Amino acid sequence: MVDDAGAAEVLGDEWRPAWSLDRLLRAPLPPPRIRTRPWWFPVQELRDPLVFYLEAWLADAIFGPDRAIIPEIEWMSQVLLTVDVVNSGDLVEISIFGWPRVQNRVKSVLLSLASWHRKHRARAEKMKQLEEFLKTGGTGPQTPEHPVA
């Protein structure tokens, strides 16, 4: 008999420690890949999606890390969105299903949000560099821009 400290469970042909199985069981489930079409979405608009790509960190910032905001965006804009990670993991593929005019509007909104998040991140990095510079006491070559005569 195995004591609790050395407890293990058999999964198929593998032995896994019980603590990793517990951790796996407590992890949140990924969202289901198959969804039913909402009653308000016309079937004919599923034929021609508008597809574009964004960096994965931008998709996390826009849609949330668990993509929880997607249903709200779909309801408010009357489109269907799919956000899938591309092979490398650095990019996500965003597909927008709906009327062409609405597809373009939603794409424009999402790209505007992406631009805002990029600028916000760049500003945060500059602020961090400035803080580091000020912490070091501002040592370095300092030449006045306008020398006083």
Curated annotation (Swiss-Prot):
InterPro entries: KH_dom_type_1_sf, KHDC1, MOEP19_KH-like. It comes from the Eukaryota. Keywords: Cytoplasm, Nucleus. One of its GO terms (cellular component) is protein-containing complex. One of its GO terms (biological process) is regulation of protein localization. Transmembrane segments: none annotated. Gene3D superfamilies: K Homology domain, type 1 (3.30.1370.10). Component of the subcortical maternal complex (SCMC), at least composed of NLRP5, KHDC3, OOEP, and TLE6. Within the complex, interacts with NLRP5, KHDC3 and TLE6. As part of the SCMC interacts with the SCMC-associated protein NLRP4F. The SCMC may facilitate translocation of its components between the nuclear and cytoplasmic compartments. Forms a scaffold complex with KHDC3/FILIA, and interacts with BLM and TRIM25 at DNA replication forks. Component of the subcortical maternal complex (SCMC), a multiprotein complex that plays a key role in early embryonic development. The SCMC complex is a structural constituent of cytoplasmic lattices, which consist in fibrous structures found in the cytoplasm of oocytes and preimplantation embryos. They are required to store maternal proteins critical for embryonic development, such as proteins that control epigenetic reprogramming of the preimplantation embryo, and prevent their degradation or activation. This is Oocyte-expressed protein. The gene is OOEP.
